[in-house]
């Protein structure tokens, strides 16, 4: 990933804005969790970091799974104890394998809830635009009955 946020170097000296870094272990956790609470709406910037990480991780899995067909299964085996799902293992592995073969993730694969950020004396607040959100929810979660 390319570090796009000021101040991460306070958590890890390698995470300097503008530098491109291959994240490993604790560094990856720092990258996806970091936010500077002194900066307004830093939670929104953190979501950008998380999307950047997901895209990079997905690309790496795609690249390495070409040479290692068992990679996706091993990744799920490692995270299984942290998962909660009502899907059978063969079902979620099929979804994952289909995703890995589907091409690159882009910004269009992510949704941000439309709305307005407001800074208050105590917290950053976000108010969803319910009218603008409705078409997104319908597109993602509903299918018209024929």
Regions found by a protein language model. Give the residues of each.
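Flexible, polar/acidic helix-loop-strand segments at domain edges
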Residues: 1-71
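Second-shell loop/turn segments in exported
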Residues: 17, 36-45, 61-66, 78-87, ...
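C-terminal solvent-exposed extensions
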Residues: 19-23, 28, 82-146
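Solvent-exposed, polar/charged alpha-helical surfaces in well-ordered, non-transmembrane soluble domains
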Residues: 30, 52-59, 70-77, 81, ...
């Amino acid at each position: 990933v390319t570090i796009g946020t000021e101040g991460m170097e306070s958590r890890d000296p390698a995470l300097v804005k503008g530098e491109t870094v291959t994240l490993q272990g604790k560094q990856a956790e720092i990258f996806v969790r970091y936010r500077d609470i002194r900066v307004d709406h830093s939670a929104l910037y953190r979501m950008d970091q998380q999307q950047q990480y997901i895209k990079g991780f997905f690309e790496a899995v795609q690249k390495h799974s070409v040479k290692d067909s068992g990679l996706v299964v091993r990744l799920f085996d490692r995270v299984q104890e942290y998962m909660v799902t009502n899907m059978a293992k063969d079902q979620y592995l099929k979804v994952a394998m289909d995703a890995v073969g589907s091409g690159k993730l882009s910004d269009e694969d992510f949704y941000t809830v439309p709305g307005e950020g407001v800074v208050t004396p105590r917290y950053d607040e976000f108010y969803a635009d319910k009218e603008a959100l409705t078409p997104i929810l319908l597109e993602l979660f509903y299918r018209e009955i024929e």
